[in-house]
């Protein structure tokens, strides 16, 4: 060690410090989100640590590259003060950035259950109100801000000690020294390339490799946010797939369908619903887990007395979301388009593609179409999206035009906005199809002053606002029931995605995506609670079925009343999850498929793919056909009838 030049000792020590800080932020990430992960024993921890190190070295090789290259390259003027200052600036900027994004994800992860990726920049760009929310986030997550201050102080202190210990002028006095240091420079560049690639394997390290070190639920502990950001930056969103011929893929899975209502579905109503006579209202609740309803959580406390009472007169399915963000949930509900790529569809390069929707189909049948959301106009590009898919009218914060009901963060409180919606529906022509996306049950979970203390606070911060939104829905239905259009209106109530949960049943791989799925009509004769799953993408074809719509539709779902194969599909970090026939499979291209019997093994501990080879083969075949249809239709702009 004594023969190693001081300059190299300094570089190695600073590199080790950067690695240490990345490790610490990973530990902080886990400590703040412990309840979201399940770790079994030391062997699991060790395996995850090895994977974590591999991803950490890849991140360091990218973000420290400017500092390392400047420090290692043999130049005669490296002792210049300006040059040294530039080295230090690059070193500090890289480390501060890595700490900041890892700590931001510490708070943000519990809302999306995935590490931040490069699409976050476009997501924030269409948020419309992000700048105004920064002070609120800093207040609510003060503990993360404090953690950053402590870690930054520790980092600065340790770096000063390192520089004091290994400070020395770097001078090259001979051609031999220059040659030696040039070889060291070339060697280090080669090592950086290997580290960035994650090793010498054929393909570079990517997000999917994290599943080699742990269960899918724990991959976020192996990954780090600096890696997921740089690895997804500038990448093509989708690639064409050719697992099967065009004829064969359609025989396995075809997104072009013709609605076919079963006779028994018609018998549930006083008389069959008909297109041209039945109004449709789709209510999408913000951040609403199935756990909040007694209808789904029979052992827990209910925070939704109205929804539970409405469910007693409705058709209830086991709802599952196709994404974890609002920007992904709305297209899944309205256009039957799930999230099957790293970037949100609405902010991707495909965002201008033509999409089908129930609104577009029903507008051809003479329906008026309207979308309601009390948030800022332009939020997540919803106003442009709904117009593109056939909604004629958009009612947002601007149209509401009364800031006395502004919540100070996102938009108009739910109760007054839902009353406003009833008034607007009274005025538009009939029949109509309308969709509502609520707002209040979202961080920072504020409710109007006059309602504080009225709703149970529960065990989680979200519970009080869930009670408020439930109350807003009650007032909406009370007012709407006085209108002529109410008696002939089909209501579908769901959520954009799930949110905070406390019970183990709702923390499993599947439980994290459980949302309400309630179908109500005043003429409904039979209350029904089904064990059948209904994903967000099933809403469009299900309504088309119930209304006896005759035209073909394009969708990545199936009517829950049709005899077609029912399934649930979800994508995260390169892994496709398929629930079909009671089995849950996990598919990653190039890897062996995993298969689990979900009801008996909700924690997905026992891979039965080898035991049930036919079922595993069926799941693989279906998943690959789905991927091919999804990718190729989006790439070719064919996601419409």
Language-model segments: residues:
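Transmembrane and membrane-interface helices of multi-pass
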Residues: 2-238
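A generic hydrophobic-helix recognition signal that picks specific residues
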Residues: 19, 49, 95-98, 279, ...
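Short, function-defining helix-loop hinge/capping sites that tune catalysis or transport
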Residues: 34, 64, 113, 294-295, ...
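Residue-level recognition of alpha-helix termini/interfacial anchor residues
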Residues: 140-144, 148, 451, 608-615, ...
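Soluble catalytic regions of membrane-associated enzymes that act on cell-envelope
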Residues: 197-554, 563-566, 572-574
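Membrane-interface soluble catalytic domains
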Residues: 205, 523-641
């Amino acid at each position: 060690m004594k023969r190693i030049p001081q300059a190299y000792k300094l570089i190695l020590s600073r590199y080790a410090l950067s690695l240490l800080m990345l490790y610490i932020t990973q530990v902080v990430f886990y400590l703040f989100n412990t309840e979201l992960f399940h770790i079994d024993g030391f062997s699991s921890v060790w395996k995850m640590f090895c994977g974590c190190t591999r991803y950490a070295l890849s991140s360091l090789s990218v973000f420290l590259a400017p500092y390392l290259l400047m420090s290692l390259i043999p130049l005669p003027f490296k002792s210049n003060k300006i040059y040294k200052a530039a080295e230090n600036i690059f070193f500090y900027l890289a480390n501060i950035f890595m700490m900041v994004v890892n700590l931001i994800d510490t708070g943000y992860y519990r809302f999306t259950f995935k590490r931040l990726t490069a699409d976050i920049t476009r997501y924030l760009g269409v948020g419309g109100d992000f700048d105004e929310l920064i002070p609120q986030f800093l207040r609510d997550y003060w503990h993360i801000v404090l953690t950053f201050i402590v870690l930054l102080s520790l980092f600065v202190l340790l770096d000063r000690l390192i520089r004091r210990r290994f400070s020395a002028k770097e001078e090259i006095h001979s051609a031999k020294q220059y040659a030696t240091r040039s070889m060291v420079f070339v060697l280090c560049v080669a090592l950086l390339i290997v580290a960035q690639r994650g090793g010498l394997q054929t393909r570079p390290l990517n997000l999917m490799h994290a599943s080699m070190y742990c269960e899918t639920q724990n991959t976020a502990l192996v990954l780090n946010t600096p890696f997921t950001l740089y690895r997804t930056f500038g990448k093509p969103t989708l690639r064409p797939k050719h697992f099967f011929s065009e004829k064969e893929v359609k025989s396995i899975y075809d997104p072009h369908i013709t609605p076919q209502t079963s006779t028994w579905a018609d018998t549930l109503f006083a008389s069959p619903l008909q297109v041209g006579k039945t109004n449709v209202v789709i209510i999408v609740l913000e951040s609403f887990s199935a756990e909040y309803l007694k209808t789904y959580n029979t052992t827990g406390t209910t925070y939704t007395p109205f929804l539970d009472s409405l469910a007693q007169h409705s058709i209830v399915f086991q709802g599952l979301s196709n994404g974890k963000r609002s920007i992904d949930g709305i297209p899944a509900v309205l256009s039957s388009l799930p999230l099957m790529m790293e970037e949100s569809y609405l902010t991707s390069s495909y965002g201008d593609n033509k999409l089908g929707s129930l609104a577009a189909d029903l507008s051809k049948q003479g329906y008026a179409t309207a979308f309601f959301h009390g948030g800022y106009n332009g939020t997540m590009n919803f106003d442009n999206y709904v117009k593109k898919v056939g909604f004629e009218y958009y009612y947002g914060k601007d149209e509401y035009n009364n800031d006395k009901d502004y919540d100070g963060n996102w938009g108009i409180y739910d109760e007054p906005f839902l009353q406003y919606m009833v008034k607007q529906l009274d005025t538009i022509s009939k029949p109509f199809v309308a969709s509502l996306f609520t707002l209040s049950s979202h961080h920072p979970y504020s409710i109007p002053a006059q309602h504080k203390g009225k709703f149970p606070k529960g065990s989680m911060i979200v519970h009080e606002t869930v009670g408020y939104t439930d109350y807003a829905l009650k007032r909406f239905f009370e007012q709407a029931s006085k209108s002529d259009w109410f008696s002939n209106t089909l209501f579908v109530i769901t959520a954009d995605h799930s949110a905070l949960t406390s019970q183990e049943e709702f923390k499993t791989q599947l439980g994290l995506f459980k949302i309400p799925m309630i179908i109500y009509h005043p003429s409904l004769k039979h209350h029904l609670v089904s064990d059948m799953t209904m994903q967000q993408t099933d809403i469009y074809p299900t309504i088309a079925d119930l209304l006896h719509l005759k035209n073909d539709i394009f969708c990545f779902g199936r009517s829950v009343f049709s005899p077609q194969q029912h399934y649930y599909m979800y994508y995260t970090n390169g892994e496709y999850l398929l629930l079909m026939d009671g089995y849950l499979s996990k598919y990653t291209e190039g890897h062996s498929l995993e298969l689990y019997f979900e009801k008996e093994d909700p924690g997905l501990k026992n891979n039965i793919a080898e035991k049930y080879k036919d079922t595993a083969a069926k799941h693989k075949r279906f998943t690959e056909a789905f991927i091919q249809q999804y990718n190729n239709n989006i790439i070719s702009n064919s996601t419409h009838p």
